[in-house]
Amino acid sequence: MMMMSLNSKQAFSMPHAGSLHVEPKYSALHSASPGSSAPAAPSASSPSSSSNAGSGGGGGGGGGGGGGGRSSSSSSSGSGGGGGGGSEAMRRACLPTPPSNIFGGLDESLLARAEALAAVDIVSQSKSHHHHPPHHSPFKPDATYHTMNTIPCTSAASSSSVPISHPSALAGTHHHHHHHHHHHHQPHQALEGELLEHLSPGLALGAMAGPDGTVVSTPAHAPHMATMNPMHQAALSMAHAHGLPSHMGCMSDVDADPRDLEAFAERFKQRRIKLGVTQADVGSALANLKIPGVGSLSQSTICRFESLTLSHNNMIALKPILQAWLEEAEKSHREKLTKPELFNGAEKKRKRTSIAAPEKRSLEAYFAIQPRPSSEKIAAIAEKLDLKKNVVRVWFCNQRQKQKRMKYSAGI
């Protein structure tokens, strides 16, 4: 008997009555005589020979027209609507009882395809990550299959759209998966403008600082990238974009810790005060570091950094720059201490000379004898009193001016 496929959308066609082959389950239909009305046969066989029979003569005529009982609807005839009733009976005979779950086969196909896709992804991922050290975190399968629901396919058996993976998409799903992430995680290079603000955590999700300070793009599914702090990676990209040295770019994860930022800000403030440099001097001195893209900063920016009122991203971005300036300032300060004649020649201030009382009484005695001693006499007095020649000369000069003032005051 011809069965209509569940997955087919072809219209049902009524086969010719003479081409049907009689099966044993309808043998009761052919046991009745063609001329009888067969009132008891339908209850024992199937709905195909139900109460569509008309009069006795009409039933006989229908049986004779069927070729001697070769039609399963021998009793289905009548006056005007016998032909239509026979077609409806044949349709019910050909259609089996529908199962309770018409999507049973579809569910099995969905499960089989999902398992095949999972096997392909896991094998390919294990091959692509075999070079990673064993201390990395294990691969998480639940992050692999999120593209399964992005390939909707319409089932041929129903008009509803079921989110399954079409067989033609199985070969390209894995490529699409990596292709999508390859474009999504490209490191941005738009950090050459403003230093502050607009530091997004996603700028460096696919980048890491290499040994020479360059940014190296890594696969999006590398397990160690999932464990890194996004703020730390943003600082890495910032350090590379502004041309900082490689040792400044290779920051540790603890740099993103607010407690470490607070400790650095306090240490920076104390060192700045000890060096005798103002916040405005720090901001203007940053331009002398010759860092590409970093010019002078305002005094308020340095103040906000020291008071921890900047945003977390800006604190991370500004920390390596201020740290580089602090290292340069302390280096210059140490050089000034070791070689003061090179740096403090113009700024050196002469200390006030203080003469003790015994030396002062001796000088007054010499002044009473000779207010204007010669250069040789001044050198002898300086050697005797263990004073510098210039100090003795200046003292005699000042003492003469003092005597003039006293005489002028006495004359008035």
From Swiss-Prot:
Q: Where is this motif: Nuclear speckle targeting signal?
A: 174-188
Q: Where is the composition biased (Low complexity)?
A: 31-53, 152-169
Gly residues composition-biased segments:
54-70, 78-87
Where is the protein found, in the record's own terms?
A: Nucleus; Nucleus speckle; Cytoplasm
Q: Name one GO cellular component term.
A: nuclear speck
Which residue ranges does the record annotate as region Disordered? 29-96, 123-191
Question: Major location, coarse class?
Answer: nucleus
Which tissues is this chain's protein expressed in? Expressed in the heart, brain and spinal cord. Expressed in cardiomyocytes (at protein level). Expressed in brain and spinal cord. Expressed in dorsal root ganglion (RGD) neurons.
**Required for transcriptional activation as annotated region, ranges:** 94-240
Query: Biased composition, Basic residues: where in the chain?
Result: 127-138, 173-187
Domain POU-specific span(s) in chain numbering: 253-330
- InterPro entries, per the entry: HD (IPR001356), Homeobox_CS (IPR017970), Homeodomain-like_sf (IPR009057), Lambda_DNA-bd_dom_sf (IPR010982), POU (IPR013847), POU_dom (IPR000327), POU_domain_TF (IPR050255)
Chain span(s) of sequence motif POU-IV box: 113-122
Q: Name one Pfam family in it.
A: Homeodomain
Q: Which domain of life is it from?
A: Eukaryota
Keywords assigned by UniProt? Activator, Apoptosis, Cytoplasm, Developmental protein, Differentiation, DNA-binding, Homeobox, Nucleus, Repressor, Transcription, Transcription regulation
Q: Transmembrane stretches, by residue range? A: none
Q: Where are the annotated segments for Required for DNA-binding and transcriptional repression?
A: 241-412
Molecular function, one GO term: promoter-specific chromatin binding
Its assembly, as annotated, is:
Interacts with POU4F1; this interaction inhibits both POU4F1 DNA-binding and transcriptional activities. Interacts (C-terminus) with ESR1 (via DNA-binding domain); this interaction increases the estrogen receptor ESR1 transcriptional activity in a DNA- and ligand 17-beta-estradiol-independent manner. Interacts (via C-terminus) with TP53 (via N-terminus). Interacts with DLX1 (via homeobox DNA-binding domain); this interaction suppresses DLX1-mediated transcriptional activity in postnatal retina enhancing retinal ganglion cell (RGC) differentiation.
Record's comment describing the protein's domains: The N-terminal transcriptional activation region is sufficient to induce transcriptional activity.
Q: Belongs to which family? A: Belongs to the POU transcription factor family. Class-4 subfamily.
Q: What is the official name of this protein in its record?
A: POU domain, class 4, transcription factor 2
What is the gene name? Answer: Pou4f2
